[in-house]
UniProtKB/Swiss-Prot annotation:
The keyword Membrane applies. This is BLOC-1-related complex subunit 8. The modification Phosphoserine is found at residue 109. Keywords: Lysosome, Membrane, Phosphoprotein. It comes from Mus musculus (Mouse). GO terms for biological process: heart development; lysosome localization; organelle transport along microtubule; regulation of endosome size; regulation of lysosome size. Component of the BLOC-one-related complex (BORC) which is composed of BLOC1S1, BLOC1S2, BORCS5, BORCS6, BORCS7, BORCS8, KXD1 and SNAPIN. Its main location: membrane. It is found in: Lysosome membrane.
Amino acid sequence: MEEPEMQLKGKKVTDKFTESVYVLANEPSVALYRLQEHVRRSLPELAQHKADMQRWEEQSQGAIYTVEYACSAVKSLVDSSVYFRSVEGLLKQAISIRDHMNTSAQGHSQEKLSPPPSLA
């Protein structure tokens, strides 16, 4: 009577052992299959996100370059205000000289047009 009971226990142990070996042998392949499925599903979306991010980065770099260029231009204008003031002063001086020359020319033309004082 003990022998059939021992055989039953031995069979249970070997069945459990065989099942464990089978699960361990197949588990990595199932995990790799699931991983492969996940990658196949996710990869196109990730590739699209990557392309979008690269496009946004290029647009951002262009905008940053434009802003930096504009800031540089404004700074150059601010720095050149000294030259603008100098040009303004020279223009005022030129206008003053022109007005003085016009006044002098009008005075000479009036002398020519007016009759000489009579010698009486």
